[in-house]
Each structure stands twice: as C-alpha cells, then as structure tokens.
Amino acid sequence: MTISVVIDTNVFVSGLRSEGGASRAVLRAALQGEVEPLFGNALWLEYRDLLARPVWSDITTPQERDQVLAALAKRGRWVTIYFGWRPNLPDEADNHLIELAIAGGASAIITHNLRDLGRGELRFGRLAILTPAQFLEVKR
C-alpha cells in the first residue's frame, strides 16, 4: 500500500536543486510511485510560482519545468479541502499544509520547517511532521 504524503515546497525545491540528498530521494520516491504526493490548490500554486522564478531559467527550460510538474501530478492525488483548521500555526501561510494533509488522510508532511509546523495549537495524532531524512528512515 502506497502511503500518502504532503511534500512542502521547501522540500520540492531542494529536491530539484540538489544532485542527491534526502529531499531528492523524497522527490524521486514520489515520481516513482513509492509514495503518493497530495496536492491542493495552494500547494500546487506554490510549486508553479516557485518554478516560474527567473533563477530556474538559467538551468531549465519552461518545458522541462512543466514536465516535472506533469510527472508529479500523474503520481499524486488532488485533494479538495472543505474544512479549514485556522487559526492553528504561528505562520498562517503554512496552515494549508495541515489542512491538505488532514483532508487527504496523509501519513506525514515532509518539510524542512519542523519548528513552525510542529507548533500548532491543534494536534493531529496520526499525522507526522518529518524532515526528508526522518521520512526516509521511517519509510524503510
């Protein structure tokens, strides 16, 4: 059974920029169907907005960036969020990750931002907040 996860934008970008490492391994696992990434409107728009920044123009073409998103979309599941869990996190901009994970039944949010995502007022017992390295260790 494939586990569902939310891949935070910081892990997505790290995975694309690095030649190796835990973030790249998480992204590879998603692209190979080993985990099911969940997407919602806010997260998908973050992915697209980040890939549209000029820094990517030096190393990839728009078509290559679209191909990465298409491959990720093919392996993932789109989730509609019907209920907001707000206010919850210190950084309001991160709440959509929790809402996506809960709505989609994710096992984990994979992020480099443990400090903010782990400090929510609400606790969701079955949802783990993990770094890419922690997730890979648990996944084994």
Give, region by region, the residue ranges found by the protein language model.
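Short, active-site-adjacent cap segments at secondary-structure transitions
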Residues: 12-13, 45, 116-118
